């Protein structure tokens, strides 16, 4: 699977661990940065990762900052994106099963490395249920963009 990633300086270390973990599993990762600890603005990195998903260049995307809040808001500003801020495995599973999210956000100051990788594995590995009631709700949600 081709997965976009993006982060700010506050989540660089965790992003690098997530990227290495995904690549080890055989996923192709497109890393939109940041690549240094220099202070930077999360919207540009989150938006770049989200645009890659929205355009179809990548199938899914993962964005990170210290809390995950800023990058999730930024990603959700891009048409076609459904980004969930995740801090537990149950939500990672349910947001794929019911909401067919195409992006997820993590807070490096909220989840540790082990939990983050477990969340990533669950989210990446869970398919949308395809149930009519969930698709109907997603369609209504996406219609709000128009």
Where do the protein language model's features map onto the residues?
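A general structural signal for well-ordered alpha-helical segments in protein cores
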Residues: 15, 42, 46, 72, ...
